[in-house]
Regions:
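The catalytic Tyr-X3-Lys active-site helix of short-chain dehydrogenase/reductase
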Residues: 111, 192, 224, 229-237
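Alpha-helical segment proximal to the catalytic Tyr-Lys
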Residues: 202, 247-248
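Conserved glycine-rich cofactor-binding loop
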Residues: 99-100
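Catalytic Tyr-X3-Lys loop
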Residues: 168, 175-195, 214, 238
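Active-site helix of classical SDR
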Residues: 197, 234, 242
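Conserved Rossmann-fold SDR core element
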Residues: 158, 249-266
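Active-site loop immediately N-terminal to the catalytic Tyr-X3-Lys motif
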Residues: 175, 223-229, 251, 295
């Protein structure tokens, strides 16, 4: 405001610093997203290099505050920097099962709304995922989750949104379920969600900035189908888990919610599974996939 008279129509920029020097520790950069912070760090380190070079000859002297203001609020500079703020800008979102149909389509939605997006999945994937990061992680193993969340926190400064999406469908009737099948289903469809949430909550509590955790549960949790108990049992338990987390950690400003998705073609709901589920309900595949009030098939991007 000291220089407002130089450009009375100028709207003040975000006053938060982009570079922070902590004596004895180092230089830190901030931004609305990871890329902005990286650019700020590049500018900062280059500026330091110029200063050091200047001191090797004589001394470094910065331009005046008035000159800085005129440069920062130059109309052409303002036009270059003008951007639309997106609804999730500044957020860091972690999605488990991120390479699956639902996980990846969800990731694209969050990316388009300005969030930093990190995908977790249990397969080796070396291809570049434009605009997103990928970490190989088996979310049924607590130690792997711990390592990955530490890496994400170190790189991005924390997390804000967790979408616990990983899942696995097994069709069995109650009389055909053996211990191995039930253990496998509970491992991915219940315990994996609990492990990821439990460790994420600890990070969100330390950050003291709230947060949001969303579970991909299933219609099976509230409206079970025949011969699908091996999948429905852990999903029904997951619905309870979501409510319990909300009761215990809502006081920290952390929100918990769940989506009860139904009949969506994905790596979980394969053609084979869909065919079996349609047969179990005595329906054609088309009628089964459009079995809702709108009579339309629901797709991952929906």
């Amino acid at each position: 405001n000291r220089n407002k008279h130089l450009n009375k129509n100028a709207q003040m920029h975000d006053p938060n610093p982009r570079l922070i020097v902590v004596k004895g520790i180092g230089l830190f950069a901030t931004g609305k997203n990871f890329n902005e912070a990286k650019i700020a760090m590049d500018v900062g380190t280059n500026a330091l290099s110029v200063m050091i070079d200047a001191f090797s000859y004589n001394k470094f002297k910065s331009i005046s505050e008035k000159e800085i203001f005129c440069m920062e609020y130059w109309p052409l500079e303002l036009a270059k920097l003008k951007k639309t703020n997106l609804s999730l800008q500044g957020n860091v979102t972690v999605i488990s099962g991120g390479l699956g149909a639902i996980g990846y389509k969800t990731a694209l939605k969050f990316l388009n709304e300005g969030s930093e997006v990190i995908l977790l999945d249990n397969i080796k994937y070396n291809k570049n995922i434009k605009g997103m990061s990928y970490f190989e992680c088996d979310v049924t193993i607590e130690s792997e989750i711990n390592k990955v969340l530490k890496k994400i926190s170190e790189k991005y400064g924390g997390i804000d949104i967790i979408i616990s999406n990983a899942g696995f469908a097994i069709q069995r009737s109650l009389e055909d379920i053996d211990k191995l099948i039930l253990d496998k289903s509970f491992a991915i469809n219940f315990f994996a969600h609990h492990y990821l949430t439990q460790q994420s909550v600890e990070i969100l509590k330390r950050q003291s900035t709230g947060g949001s955790i969303l579970f991909n549960i299933s219609k099976q949790a509230v409206n079970p189908g025949v011969n699908f108990a091996s999948y429905g049992l852990p999903k029904a338990t997951l619905l309870f888990l979501m409510k319990q987390y909300a009761l215990e950690f809502g006081k920290y400003g952390i929100r918990f919610n769940g989506i009860n998705a139904d009949r969506i073609k994905s790596g979980l709901m394969t053609k084979k599974i869909i065919s079996k589920r349609a047969k179990a309900r005595g329906l054609s595949i088309n009628d089964y996939m459009s079995g809702n009030l709108l009579k339309k098939e629901v797709k991952p991007e929906d």
